[in-house]
């Protein structure tokens, strides 16, 4: 196993080591990702449960509002809507959770919601029954009043000489007072559903029925009318009892809903507490798993680092010893290499390098003698070459000086033409920039003109709408005047009614006061609308003048744009001619510089040739000296 690992490549060794670390790191990341996903899911579930609790709170508030509103249809619809929202959230949670404990709680919660809905429907039926009972009481009271009115008219129509006429009328008035007291007691019972109020209302009804029996004895001729009155009072009593039963049903439903609501809250809190406990358990598991995976990754990483380091550093140390021996001149060693990885290939290369160096040193010894004899011959030839190169250098310097002066003159012309071209280009750019600015100004002014036109139309529309508001205010003013008259008439009628109409008179005075304040506010609004219409007209006139000035500005900007276009065209022509002049001068300058460079190159070559000849002569002497030194150095190697 160790031999196999030693023979695989360093890339593969490092790849295996880092690969194991990366795999464990990936597993660690996967573990963290999975744990994080579980926590996120748990948080989402807790959020859903929080939404369920919010829906429950909304439902309980809606139920209280429904009870405060005494069974109002709008409040009932709102309560049903909140109950449906709560039920839908519960059904959604039932499809989301898979744990048996959660599913059981959600199932129990669903059953409680169904029972809660039944109780709510019973309460609605109770409120519907109370409304029906009140309608029945009102209709029965109206029939009883009508019977008493007809009976009173018949009694009052009798001759004044009738001795029993006054006594019969007093009995009828007493029965009417009894009926009025019954209605007052029933209203008190409706306002406060207490047993005492209920018994008081029923006792008063029984008293009214007893007076009816007395009337039957006193007025046997009016038995039909009295029977109608008695039937109406009996129906009124039945309606009161229906109201009592409906109130009892409402009270029972309220108690049931209170218990069911508390049960829903308890189960919802239990469901939320379960999620908290599961979250804590999953957090602990995630931390433990992360710690184990981290320790395992660190352990494997350390082991891989130690093993790979030993497989790489030991052969490197052996190779370093061999290289140091070669550096010290000892070429007698022979390395034995068995590894087949990159380090083995390196050791084999160093072994071949030692063999090659031995052969090289042996060859150098033989070549040093030949170099010494060749150096003497080279020195003689170099002296002749140096004399000819010095003569050529003098002639080339004279030609180079003349060409340099001509090139300087041509470059001056080219610079002047180029400066003129740059100036024309700058003028052309400025003219084009001015043209663009004018174009943008024209566009801005045209858009301003369009905005002014739209603003004028908007002001006209505002003026029309303010006129419509004026007509609406006339209607409101007329309605306020009519309300004032109606309130005045109601106050007069209430005054005629005396003590019984005092409360109605107070209400009529309040309505009249409201109508007068409405009329006064309407007049103030009319004044504001008139001021608004006047200001709107002034703004519209001013915007018409601004629109005319804007159109004139657009025309002037267009003329300025045309002038800038002409200037731009002229500057472009000047720029084109300057560019042609500059191009011609640059071509002449380039030709002159090319000739000058060629002559300078010739001169440089001559100088280099002369210098090379001198150096060659010196090198020949030096070469002979180096040959001796080389023989001395080669003798240091042991082969």
Curated annotation (Swiss-Prot):
Record-level GO cellular component terms: plasma membrane
Keyword entries, A-Z: Cell membrane, Chemotaxis, Coiled coil, Membrane, Methylation, Transducer, Transmembrane, Transmembrane helix
Annotated Methyl-accepting transducer domain residues: 367-603
Domain HAMP: 310-362
Regulation: Binding of citrate to the ligand-binding domain reduces the chemotaxis towards the strong attractants such as malate and succinate. However, in physiologically relevant niches, citrate is mostly complexed with magnesium or calcium ions, and does not bind McpS.
Deletion consequences: Mutant fails to respond to succinate but responds to toluene.
UniProt keyword Secreted, yes or no: no
Residues noted as binding acetate in the record, renumbered to the chain: 138, 183, 187, 236
Function text: Chemotactic-signal transducers respond to changes in the concentration of attractants and repellents in the environment, transduce a signal from the outside to the inside of the cell, and facilitate sensory adaptation through the variation of the level of methylation. McpS is a specific chemoreceptor for 6 tricarboxylic acid (TCA) cycle intermediates (succinate, fumarate, malate, oxaloacetate, citrate and isocitrate), butyrate and acetate. Malate, succinate, fumarate and oxaloacetate cause the strongest chemotactic response.
Record PANTHER family: METHYL-ACCEPTING CHEMOTAXIS PROTEIN MCPB (PTHR32089), METHYL-ACCEPTING CHEMOTAXIS PROTEIN TLPQ (PTHR32089:SF120)
Name of the featured protein: Methyl-accepting chemotaxis protein McpS
Species of origin: Pseudomonas putida (strain ATCC 47054 / DSM 6125 / CFBP 8728 / NCIMB 11950 / KT2440)
């Amino acid at each position: 196993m160790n031999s196999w690992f030693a023979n695989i490549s360093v890339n593969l060794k490092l790849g295996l080591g880092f690969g194991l670390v990366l795999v464990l790191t990936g597993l660690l990341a996967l573990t963290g990702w999975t744990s994080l996903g579980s926590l996120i899911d748990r948080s989402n579930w807790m959020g859903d449960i929080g939404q369920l609790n919010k829906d429950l709170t909304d439902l309980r508030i809606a139920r209280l509002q429904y009870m405060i509103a005494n069974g109002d249809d709008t409040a009932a619809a709102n309560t049903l809507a909140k109950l449906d929202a709560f039920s839908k959230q519960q059904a959604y949670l039932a499809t989301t959770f898979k744990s048996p404990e959660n599913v059981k709680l959600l199932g129990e919660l669903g059953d409680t919601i169904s029972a809660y809905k039944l109780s709510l429907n019973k309460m609605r039926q109770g409120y519907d029954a109370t409304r029906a009972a009140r309608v029945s009481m009102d209709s029965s009271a109206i029939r009883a009043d009508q019977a008493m009115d007809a009976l009173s008219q018949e009694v009052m129509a009798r001759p004044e000489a009738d001795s029993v006429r006054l006594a019969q009328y007093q009995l009828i008035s007493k029965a009417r007072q009894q009926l009025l007291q019954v209605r007052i007691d029933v209203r008190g019972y409706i306002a406060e559903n207490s047993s005492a109020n209920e018994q008081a209302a029923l006792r008063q009804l029984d008293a009214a029925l007893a007076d009816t029996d007395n009337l039957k004895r006193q007025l046997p001729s009016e038995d039909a009318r009295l029977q109608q009155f008695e039937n109406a009072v009996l129906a009124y009593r039945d309606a009161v009892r229906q109201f009592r039963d409906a109130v009892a049903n409402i009270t029972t439903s309220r108690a049931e809903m209170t218990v069911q609501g508390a049960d829903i809250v308890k189960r919802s809190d239990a469901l939320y507490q379960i999620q908290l406990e599961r979250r804590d358990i999953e957090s602990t598991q995630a931390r433990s798993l992360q710690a184990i995976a981290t320790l395992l990754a660190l352990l494997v990483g350390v082991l891989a680092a130690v093993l790979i380091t030993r497989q790489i550093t030991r052969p490197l140390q052996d190779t370093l010893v061999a290289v140091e021996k070669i550096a010290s001149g000892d070429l007698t060693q022979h390395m034995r290499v068995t590894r087949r990885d990159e380090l083995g290939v390196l050791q084999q290369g160093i072994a071949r390098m030692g063999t090659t160096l031995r052969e090289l040193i042996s060859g150098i010894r033989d070549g040093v003698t030949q170099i010494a004899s060749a150096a003497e011959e080279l020195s003689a030839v170099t002296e002749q070459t140096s004399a000819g190169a010095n003569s050529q250098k003098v002639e080339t310097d004279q030609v180079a000086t003349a060409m340099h002066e001509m090139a300087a003159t041509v470059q001056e012309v080219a610079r002047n033409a180029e400066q003129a071209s740059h100036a024309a280009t700058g003028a052309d750019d400025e003219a084009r920039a001015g043209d663009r600015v004018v174009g943008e100004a024209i566009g801005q002014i045209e858009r301003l003109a369009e905005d002014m036109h739209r603003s004028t139309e908007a002001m006209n529309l505002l003026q029309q709408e303010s006129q419509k508001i004026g007509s609406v205010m006339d209607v409101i003013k007329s309605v306020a005047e009519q309300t004032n008259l109606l309130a005045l008439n109601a106050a007069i009628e209430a005054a005629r009614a005396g003590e019984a109409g005092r409360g109605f008179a107070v209400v009529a005075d309040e309505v009249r006061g409201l109508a007068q304040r409405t009329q006064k506010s309407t007049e103030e609004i009319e004044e504001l609308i008139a001021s608004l219409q006047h200001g709107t007209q002034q703004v519209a006139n001013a915007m018409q003048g601004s629109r005319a000035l804007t159109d004139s500005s657009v025309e002037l900007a267009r003329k300025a744009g045309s002038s800038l276009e002409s200037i731009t065209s002229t500057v472009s022509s000047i720029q084109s001619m300057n560019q042609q002049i500059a191009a011609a001068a640059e071509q002449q300058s380039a030709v002159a510089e090319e000739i000058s460079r060629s002559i300078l190159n010739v001169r440089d070559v001559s100088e280099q040739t002369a210098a090379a000849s001198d150096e060659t002569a010196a090198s020949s002497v030096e070469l002979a000296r180096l040959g001796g030194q080389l023989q001395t150095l080669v003798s240091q190697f042991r082969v």
